[in-house]
């Protein structure tokens, strides 16, 4: 019989007894109740794993073991336990017992709870607990949502009619313009001011549905790829031979594309859907898919970004999909191969950096013009010719064969769509819709196998290819590129066939509707994120960046008819995805174009993002890229520049909390929130170890270098995991360089390779360093020890010092030359350090200073700073100065503009 009484010899607490008692209840439930026990048996067999529970001082140390369909409790933690939950204290353990799911997330984020070992088994364990406690958890979550709604209503009790009236007024007060752009051939009023959303009932219906849709977890992709792998093997094939990774992926991809449902969305002009649901969340099992295992019952009830899920999807994911992929995903592959390395442990504490390669490597832009101009059949012919070259080795031939298999799969899907469109047309009673479906069937017989001939075919080819790319790579940051440039030739070719002004006007309206339909199709999917990510990233969308305007590869004006058509659609729909970016080149692009960008941004109150072409080209030029390719850049994901169709830039490989390095420098290498003596010991402030400001700056950079080195180490390991678990042969066929090299894009096949980091907290670090330099060393108004004590106590005991910091120190954004120089010093150090690190795919590591919504998450996980920012408050977003830096917005703008590109 299990002894549940605390053992004084082991110094275990009463909490240990309490936890063992509760675990015994859990074990009894799964042992005695068939309705619970059935969840322990999956297609892979019994769920066999051990979960340990302990505290930092080991006052609690016990485990629950699931094996052979039975559960038992141990009074110790076996060495072979798959996962151990480590609580900061007994109080934290007790807190978890009454915690809501949201409370549990914040316990992880705030280091009251950390995890050692296999995250998948942790999620499986919490799923089993949710089976047992389903009703209680759902009740808690409903209460949380009610409280959240109440708080929101308290902050804004009534609808802001003044704001909605203002936006409506902006939409009514649209500008007109005469065409002044040399490459705009057919738009007399390039602003297309006569059109409103009311002129496009199809688009208005789509938009209304989008604004009320709740995404649903879609099981199609994981079901099909899991089925194929179970039949054909993963590590080895049916005959026991090791799979070549790209070939394995390509065969599975082809099976997926041949067997997924060909759906024509209701009333759409475009063929195909990203998922089998009207708006679906794709489960990528080798990426981050298994992270929602613990939420299969609760995901419809969470406060932020709830997703619906059917009973059948829940059953399929738990019993068939997740057990198969539990060890075959990026995170766990690295953990097993490299024995839970320190770099991974740091990432899983959430407060220092986050590595996106745990989920995807998809921040890039495919060469869409290639498939539009050649069609898949000609691409296959070219790749086949490359395979026959005598200098090709076995690995290169396998990679090239994998590209062919993927292109064949894409063609099969397009043919299936053609057949579906034909069937839908035969059943359609409305003659107008019937004709549209018949045209769709014809288009899908032409593209993607053959070149596009019309704008209608080109947009359909784009969309089908886009679906195909998202069947291979996660829908996060994969971007669309310069669609106005790539679609303009088809627009011109169509217009040249039309003679009468009336027909041309009707065609322009149809082109607007077609592009609008494309925008709305891009909203038919949503990233599948665990609830923790909602607090970490703020519910980010897929970030499908689209880029307009700027200059051509030759340096000429790139603004054309399609540029303005895309801007019209952007104005009317005002969507966050696609993420529209506009390039503007001074002295090349017209004032007409610039005014239109400003007008659309004003009407939508959000978009497009506007980029100075000259500054971006200047920033990219030192990288050694061909100038024509630099001029052809597009935004990726959020705003990051990538060379279109030639560059695996993975511009957002990681989110880096630079403030963590500052905190560690202030604490001799210890990270305060995690209470972890992590970095090098660089000096104790209280002991007066820093005689000069430069000595402290050196300590800061040493801590930052330590964090960067660990993050890059993890990035390399995850890159290796991608090469084995999920090479991307279809994407590789659309990135220049891969075919010539016979290499997958994950293995350095692209013509240009790089990875980019998003550094968060530049203004906060700069201001903190300015306070230390000016008040401690230059003016000697406060000792470093006194400043640190104020920081450690959140300035609660020294409001006078807080006022001095905020009002008497020249901060970034105040107009101070010295503050700008400090910001440039910090940014240059980061740039130079990353630039010197060898890249596993070749190329460079690049730096950027933007934050998505990470400035909030990292700020929540950081203490007070010398800058006067208080504990838990958000950092400033991107390059934005502190709000108290200056009363003048112009000072803020000028200081940001004076940062070195």
Feature annotation, model-predicted:
Residues 98, 110, 427-429, 496-497, ...:
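Charged, alpha-helical scaffolding/interaction elements associated with membrane systems
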Residues 107, 421-426, 490-494, 775:
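Hydrophobic side-chain positions on well-ordered alpha-helices
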Residues 87, 102, 127, 412-423, ...:
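Generic structural signal for well-ordered, non-membrane alpha-helices
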Residues 1-171:
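Feature captures hydrophobic
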Residues 174-399, 432, 436-439, 443, ...:
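Conserved catalytic cores of very large enzyme subunits
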Residues 401-412:
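Extended non-globular scaffold/tether segments
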Residues 419-437:
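Short, Lys/Glu-rich amphipathic helical modules
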């Amino acid at each position: 019989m299990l002894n549940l009484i605390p053992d004084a010899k082991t110094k275990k607490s009463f909490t240990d007894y309490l936890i063992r008692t509760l675990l015994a209840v859990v074990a009894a439930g799964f042992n005695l109740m068939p309705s619970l026990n059935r969840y322990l048996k999956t297609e892979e067999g019994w769920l066999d794993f051990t979960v340990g529970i302990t505290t930092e001082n080991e006052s609690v140390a016990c485990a629950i073991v699931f094996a052979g369909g039975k559960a038992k409790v141990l009074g110790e933690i076996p060495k072979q336990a798959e996962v151990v939950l480590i609580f900061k204290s007994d109080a934290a353990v007790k807190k978890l017992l009454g915690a809501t799911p949201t409370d549990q997330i914040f316990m992880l984020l705030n280091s009251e709870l950390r995890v050692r070992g296999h995250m998948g088994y942790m999620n499986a364990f919490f799923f089993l607990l949710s089976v047992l406690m389903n009703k209680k958890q759902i009740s808690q979550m409903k209460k949380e949502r009610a409280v959240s709604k109440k708080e929101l209503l308290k902050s804004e009790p009534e609808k802001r009619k003044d704001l909605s009236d203002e936006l409506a007024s902006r939409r009514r007060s649209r500008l007109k313009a005469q065409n002044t752009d040399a490459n705009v051939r057919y738009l007399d009023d390039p602003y297309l001011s006569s059109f409103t959303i009311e002129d496009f009932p199809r688009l208005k219906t789509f938009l209304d549905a989008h604004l009320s849709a709740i995404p649903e977890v879609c099981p199609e992709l994981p079901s099909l790829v899991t089925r194929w792998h179970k039949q054909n093997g993963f590590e080895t094939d049916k005959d026991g031979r090791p799979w070549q990774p790209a070939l394995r992926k390509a065969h599975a991809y082809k099976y997926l594309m041949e067997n997924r449902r060909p759906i024509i969305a209701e009333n759409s002009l475009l063929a195909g859907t990203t998922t089998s649901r009207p708006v679906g969340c794709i489960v990528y099992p080798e990426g981050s898919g298994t992270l929602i295992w613990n939420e299969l019952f609760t995901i419809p009830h969470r406060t932020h970004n709830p997703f619906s899920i059917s009973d059948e999807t829940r059953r399929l994911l738990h019993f068939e999909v997740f057990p198969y992929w539990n060890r075959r995903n990026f995170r766990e592959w690295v953990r097993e191969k490299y024995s839970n390395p320190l770099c991974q442990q740091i990432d899983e504490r959430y407060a220092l950096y986050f590595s996106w390669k745990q989920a995807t490597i998809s921040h890039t832009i495919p060469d869409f013009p290639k498939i539009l101009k050649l069609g898949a059949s000609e691409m296959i012919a070219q790749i086949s010719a490359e395979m026959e070259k005598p200098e090709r080795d076995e690995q290169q031939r396998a990679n090239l064969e994998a590209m062919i298999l993927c292109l064949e799969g894409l063609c099969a899907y397009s043919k299936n769509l053609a057949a579906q469109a034909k069937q839908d047309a035969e059943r359609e009673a409305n003659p107008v819709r019937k004709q549209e479906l018949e045209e769709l069937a014809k288009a899908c017989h032409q593209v993607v196998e053959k070149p596009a001939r019309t704008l209608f075919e080109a947009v359909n080819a784009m969309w089908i290819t886009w679906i195909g790319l998202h069947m291979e790579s996660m829908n996060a940051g994969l971007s669309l590129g310069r669609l106005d440039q790539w679609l303009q030739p088809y627009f011109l070719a169509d217009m040249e066939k039309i003679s009468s002004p009336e027909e041309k006007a009707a065609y322009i309206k149809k082109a607007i509707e077609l592009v609008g339909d494309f925008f709305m199709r891009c909203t038919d999917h949503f990233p599948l994120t665990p609830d923790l990510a909602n607090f970490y990233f703020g519910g980010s969308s897929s970030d499908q960046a689209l880029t307009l305007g700027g200059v051509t590869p030759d340096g000429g004006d790139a603004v054309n008819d399609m540029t303005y058509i895309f801007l019209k659609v952007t104005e009317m729909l005002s969507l966050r995805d696609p993420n529209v970016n506009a390039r503007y080149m001074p002295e090349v692009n017209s004032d007409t174009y610039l005014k239109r960008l400003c007008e659309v941004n004003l009407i939508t109150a959000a978009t497009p993002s506007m980029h100075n072409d000259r500054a971006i080209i200047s920033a990219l030029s030192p990288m050694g890229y061909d100038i024509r390719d630099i001029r052809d850049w597009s935004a990726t994901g959020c705003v990051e520049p990538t060379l279109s169709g030639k560059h695996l830039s993975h511009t957002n490989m990681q989110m880096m909390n630079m403030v963590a390095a500052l905190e560690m420098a202030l604490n001799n290498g210890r990270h305060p929130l995690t209470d972890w003596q992590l970095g090098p010991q660089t000096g104790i402030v209280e002991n007066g170890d820093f005689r000069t400001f430069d000595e402290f700056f050196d300590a800061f950079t040493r801590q930052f270098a330590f964090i960067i080195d660990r993050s890059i180490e993890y990035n390399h390991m995850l890159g290796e995991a991608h090469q084995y678990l999920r090479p991307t042969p279809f994407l590789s066929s659309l990135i220049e360089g891969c075919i010539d090299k016979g290499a997958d894009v994950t293995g350095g096949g692209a013509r240009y390779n790089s990875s980019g980091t998003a550094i968060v907290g530049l203004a906060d670090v700069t201001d903190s360093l300015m306070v230390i330099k000016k008040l401690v060393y230059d003016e000697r108004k406060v000792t470093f020890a006194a400043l640190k004590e104020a920081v450690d106590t959140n300035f609660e005991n020294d409001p006078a010092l807080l006022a001095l910091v905020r009002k008497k120190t020249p901060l970034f954004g105040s107009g101070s030359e010295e503050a700008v120089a400090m910001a440039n010093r910090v940014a240059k150090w980061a740039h130079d350090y990353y630039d010197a690190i060898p890249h596993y795919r070749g190329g460079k590591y690049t730096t950027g200073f933007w934050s998505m919504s990470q400035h909030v998450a990292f700020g929540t996980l950081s203490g007070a700073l010398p800058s006067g920012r208080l504990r838990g408050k958000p950092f400033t977003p991107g390059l934005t100065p502190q709000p108290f830096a200056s009363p003048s917005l112009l000072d803020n703008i000028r200081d940001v503009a004076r940062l070195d590109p």
